[in-house]
Design a protein with these regions (language model features):
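Secreted/periplasmic carbohydrate-active enzymes, especially glycoside hydrolases
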Residues: 1-122, 150-160, 165-166, 183-185, ...
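Substrate-binding/catalytic cleft of secreted carbohydrate-active enzymes
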Residues: 89-92, 98-279
């Protein structure tokens, strides 16, 4: 391991409005012989979460105007298409979006690079399942053997990207209601802290009746709650962190162009014709 320290005079700070990037060329010599070289693109910015105040970027308070963005590209499929990703991000930028949550998997490097360039803050998410199954063929079958390896690879791969402002260790994992769930959360969060002490860690929690009382939410650096916005105040007052993150607050489940009239209050607005009303 080689450690270097250097000074950048009058740096241009990275932000969604000014996504300034730098390039570091690293060359290692043994005598006059080059043994290795590497090019790292990076940005300069500060970030912190202040108890009782919220998230700060470059010393200024900031709210996330974000989306939970799944890795597929609609009819184009899940294979990486840089042009399609750029087009998608440009449309999000036009509508005022400045943050991306990689729902609910580790992102392609191309997406993170584009977020660096276009100016999106990222919550990079690792897992949709831990050691307790959501489905029979899920990641729980590999968790014990691969969880730490996968987390280490994710953090090391993206820790130099300025767009990444937070790590997420999971989404709506059934383990959150297990009596030992907080230990698994602490295990994964500790890996993030060990590999990258500069960023905070969250998890998308959707079982507040469990996590507010079993120690799970109390473990997290940042308390991420999916939906249940009516419980934000209770969670904020109950937990010691002094912060709440709306990690997932709305779902665009509807059939395009379908509007059922008269409008009725209906869970997910599902009807017998298998359509979902956009109202």
């Amino acid at each position: 391991t080689v450690f270097m320290r250097f000074t950048v005079r009058r740096p241009e700070f990275w932000s969604p409005e000014t996504p300034s990037l730098y390039t570091a060329h690293t060359t290692i010599y043994e005598g006059n012989h080059i043994t290795d070289s590497y090019i790292t693109r990076f940005g300069i910015r500060s970030m912190e979460v202040i108890k009782g105040k919220g998230f700060y970027l470059n010393g200024a308070p900031r709210k996330f105007k974000g989306v939970c963005n799944h890795h597929d590209l609609g009819p184009l499929g899940a294979a990486v298409n840089r042009s399609a990703l750029k087009h998608q991000l440009e449309m999000l930028k036009d509508m005022g979006c400045d943050a991306i949550r990689t729902s609910h998997n580790m992102p392609a490097p191309e997406l993170v690079e584009l977020c660096d360039e276009l100016g999106f803050m990222m919550m990079v998410e690792a897992f949709d399942e831990w050691d307790i199954a959501k489905c029979a063929n899920g990641y729980h079958r590999h968790f014990d053997e691969w969880a730490e390896k996968d987390m280490v690879n994710m953090v090391r791969n993206f820790r130099n990207n300025p767009s990444v402002v937070m790590w997420s260790i999971g989404n709506e994992v059934p383990t959150q209601c297990d009596e030992h769930g907080y230990k698994v959360a602490a295990f994964l969060q500790d890996i993030c802290h060990r590999e990258d002490p500069t960023r905070l860690v969250t998890c998308g929690l959707d079982q507040p009746q469990c996590v507010l009382t079993n120690g799970f939410a109390e473990v997290m650096d940042v308390v991420g709650i999916n939906y249940y916005t009516e419980l934000y105040k209770k969670a904020y007052e109950t937990l010691p962190q002094g912060n709440i993150l709306g990690s997932e607050t709305a779902s665009t489940v509807s059939s395009r162009g379908v509007y059922k009239i008269p409008v009725e209050l209906k869970y997910r607005a599902m009807y017998e014709d298998h359509q979902s009303s956009s109202y």
